[in-house]
Amino acid sequence: FMFFGCSSFNSDVTFTNTSNVLSMGAMFRTATVFNKPLNFDTSSVTDMSNMLRSTAFDQDISGFNISSLTTASAMFLYNTAFSTTNYDLLLVGWEGQTHNNSVNFHAGTAQYSSGAPATARAGLISDSWTITDGGQV
């Protein structure tokens, strides 16, 4: 809940050590103008639910280590800014990592492209992920 409700927050966020953080749930929820790169160590994070809900966030987070992730429900709910380009990168990047099965992931209205992104999305779904998004472009 670190920046939850900070509607005008759009500053660089650099944390020296997030390696022990378990939950980033609702971290930027309703920080409506937030759109800065995130370079967090997410290797221990299990919860990203509501993390970027209702934000203007459109950055590449395909490099987030999701090996411990168990829920990302409503992660991008009400976020209409997340671009196809960054969603494609996320799908391909996350599917290519070691990840848990049965993760609930909400990508808001983001849409994905055919080819590698569609294949990556199908791969996550075959690992029992529930993915809610805006569908294929």
Task: Give short role names for the model-derived ranges.
Residues 1-137:
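Negatively charged
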